Structures are given as C-alpha cells and as structure tokens.
Amino acid sequence: MSKKHMKGNGGEVPENSEMSGSEELVAVEPGEPDYRELLARKEEELKQSQDRLLRMAAELDNTRKRLEREKSEGIAYANEGLMKDLLPVLDNLERALEHSENEADCGSLVEGVRMTLKGFLDSLARFGCTPFESVGNAFDPNFHEAVMQEEVADYPERTVIREFQKGYTLKERLLRPAMVVVSKAAGDT
C-alpha cells in the first residue's frame, strides 16, 4: 500500500483510510499554490471592490443632489444682477416723489411718478424682490449699514431711527443692506 504526504495534522495517512467528520485533507504538491488561500484573497479583493463601488455610488448620488440644489438656486437667483442695477432707478423715483410733494403745482407729476413707482415695486415683488422695514427696528449688521449715530430720547439704544436708502431682499437673500442712522445713548462718543 502506497502512502502520500497529506497536508493536515502533519502525519502520514494511508491512501485508503477513511476520514472522520468534516476534516478534509488536500494533497499539496511542493510549489503548487494553495487554492484556499488564493480564494480567500480573491474574496477579500471582491469585498473591497464592492465597498469602493458602494462608496462611489453614494458619492455620485450626493454630487447629483448637490448639482440639482445649485441649479435650482441658480435659477432662483439668476436675476440678482438685474435687480441690483434697477435699485438706483427705484431710489431716484422715490427721491423725485419726496421733493415734488412740496410743490403745489406738480400734483399730476407727483401722481404719475407715484403710479410708476407702485407699478415698479409690484413688478419687482413678482420676482421676489421686496424692500424691508428698518426704522424702529433694532440695528442688525446683517441687514443694515450704519452711516451715522445720533442721540435720540424717543428710541432705545442701537435702534434704526432714520433710513437714507432702503434695503432689499431677493426671495430670502439680502440684495442690498439699508443705509441707516442708529440711535445711541446720551453722552456716548
């Protein structure tokens, strides 16, 4: 009876002997690769590849969502430059109304400018551009640009008491801060 060297417990096993349980002995020739080790390495490589694939898919999905969000913001705020350019025109209309109200013979001019201003403001509002109130509100550096401070007894400290130029928002984004005068406590320099 011939015997072969078998990998396993290191001993010799007769060729016709029966194996017990789930122990499996595989003959390995010197210089021949161990297929179980090779299979284990390939399974690990497969796991890593699947993990990389899942990460890349998640990254692609996140990029797609970010691009969609940026696109919708771009559409919503596409007119921002136009709105900024129109604001000085709006300011001039308001100034014309302010100065012409003192003239008695300019009634029809005042009414025409007032109607133009109202139509202009309505058009801006349709696109989400609206002025915000500042006078009487607390000074907020996110929405107001203080050009002066003034001692006033009628208002609490750091309250907007006068507006030189209105502030505007485009949807929920600040388009232009309001230029304001802010109250200060008596005796502050």
Curated annotation (Swiss-Prot):
Keyword field: Chaperone, Cytoplasm, Stress response
GO cellular component: cytoplasm
PANTHER family linked to this entry: GRPE PROTEIN, GRPE PROTEIN HOMOLOG, MITOCHONDRIAL
Quaternary data: Homodimer.
Record bears the keyword Ribosomal protein: no
Primary subcellular site in the record, as a coarse category: cytoplasm
Role of this protein: Participates actively in the response to hyperosmotic and heat shock by preventing the aggregation of stress-denatured proteins, in association with DnaK and GrpE. It is the nucleotide exchange factor for DnaK and may function as a thermosensor. Unfolded proteins bind initially to DnaJ; upon interaction with the DnaJ-bound protein, DnaK hydrolyzes its bound ATP, resulting in the formation of a stable complex. GrpE releases ADP from DnaK; ATP binding to DnaK triggers the release of the substrate protein, thus completing the reaction cycle.
Organism: Syntrophobacter fumaroxidans (strain DSM 10017 / MPOB)
Superkingdom of the source species: Bacteria
Higher taxonomy: Bacteria, Pseudomonadati, Thermodesulfobacteriota, Syntrophobacteria, Syntrophobacterales
Annotated region described as Disordered, given as residue ranges: 1-31
Gene transcribed to yield this protein: grpE
UniProt protein name: Protein GrpE
Family per record: Belongs to the GrpE family.
GO BP term, pick one: protein folding
Compartment(s): Cytoplasm
Keyword Cytoplasm on entry: yes
Example of a GO MF term: adenyl-nucleotide exchange factor activity
